[in-house]
């Protein structure tokens, strides 16, 4: 005579219930939490950022929600990107995040490669449609860049200063109405801040956001395109470090 193990069905049901609750919780979260829901008609009419064209050995392509979600999720769960991005999401949430960007006009998710190997996740977004817009004199055609380099070895070898100028040059060429490229690293991310300053960005101060304090930078097409700095809330990273 076989005895039923009454514990197993209970555990199985409990596991399914937890999984379902997790899915519900994920579904209720904003898919694009930084996108502004109220913008002017002028800002709303501006299309999504263009796809930059890079010369070999670099390349950028649109991210595929179905094909790339697993890879991006694995990247974003690596310690250095958990710290920098705080997006250690499971693949299903990344799939929703990618699809929402592709379906809208706010941002575009991209995969960057070097010598044919995928190495970086990039988001180009319209800064005037983003939560950073109220923090400076945003122009409807400004474009922001977020980049997540997957391999820490590439980070340590200065990959960002090699990639960034190529992306910026292509964006300015393709979108002649874009006057500025925006960056908003965490105020503690000295590596990203040094890249911004190396590129010649204008520092627009540190600003408290909903979940973090960010350092805002603008890379203008020409010096005349730089937004006004106003009363800065902090010094550039180099000055902060040298004075401490």
From Swiss-Prot:
One of its GO terms (biological process) is siderophore biosynthetic process. Substrate binds at residue 146. The keyword Nucleotide-binding does not apply. Coiled coil: none annotated. Residues 231-244 have a biased composition (Polar residues). The active site is at 184 (proton acceptor). It is an enzyme of class 2 (transferase). Its EC number is 2.3.1.-. Pathway: Siderophore biosynthesis; mycobactin biosynthesis. Residues 224-244 are annotated as: Disordered. Keywords: Acyltransferase, Transferase. InterPro entries: Acyl_CoA_acyltransferase, Acyltransferase_MbtK/IucB-like. Pfam families: Acetyltransf_8. One of its GO terms (molecular function) is N-acyltransferase activity. PANTHER family: LYSINE N-ACYLTRANSFERASE C17G9.06C-RELATED (PTHR31438:SF1). Acyltransferase required for the direct transfer of medium- to long-chain fatty acyl moieties from a carrier protein (MbtL) on to the epsilon-amino group of lysine residue in the mycobactin core. Belongs to the lysine N-acyltransferase MbtK family. Monomer. This is Lysine N-acyltransferase MbtK. It comes from Mycobacterium sp. (strain MCS). The lineage of its organism: Bacteria, Bacillati, Actinomycetota, Actinomycetes, Mycobacteriales.
């Amino acid at each position: 005579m076989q005895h039923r193990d009454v514990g197993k069905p209970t555990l199985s049901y409990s596991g399914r219930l937890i999984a379902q609750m997790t899915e519900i919780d994920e579904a209720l979260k904003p898919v694009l939490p930084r996108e502004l829901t109220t913008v002017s008609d002028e800002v709303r009419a501006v299309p999504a950022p263009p796809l930059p064209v890079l010369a070999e050995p670099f390349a950028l392509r649109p991210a595929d929600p179905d094909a790339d979600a697993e890879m991006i999720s694995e990247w974003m769960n690596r310690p250095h990107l958990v710290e920098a991005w705080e997006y250690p999401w499971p693949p299903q949430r990344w799939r929703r995040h990618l699809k929402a960007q592709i379906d809208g006009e706010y941002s575009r998710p991209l995969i960057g490669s070097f010598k044919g190997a995928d190495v970086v996740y990039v988001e180009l977004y319209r800064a005037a449609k983003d939560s950073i817009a109220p923090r400076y004199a945003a122009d409807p055609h400004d474009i922001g860049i977020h980049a997540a380099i997957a391999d820490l070895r590439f980070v340590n070898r200065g990959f960002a200063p090699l990639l960034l100028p190529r992306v910026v040059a292509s964006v300015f060429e393709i979108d002649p109405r874009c006057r500025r490229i925006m960056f908003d690293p965490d105020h503690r991310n000295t590596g990203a801040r040094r890249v911004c300053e190396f590129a010649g960005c204008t520092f627009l101060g540190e600003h408290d956001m909903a979940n973090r304090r960010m350092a805002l930078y603008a890379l203008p097409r020409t010096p005349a395109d730089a937004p006004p700095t106003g009363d800065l809330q902090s010094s550039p990273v180099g000055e902060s470090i040298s004075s401490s």
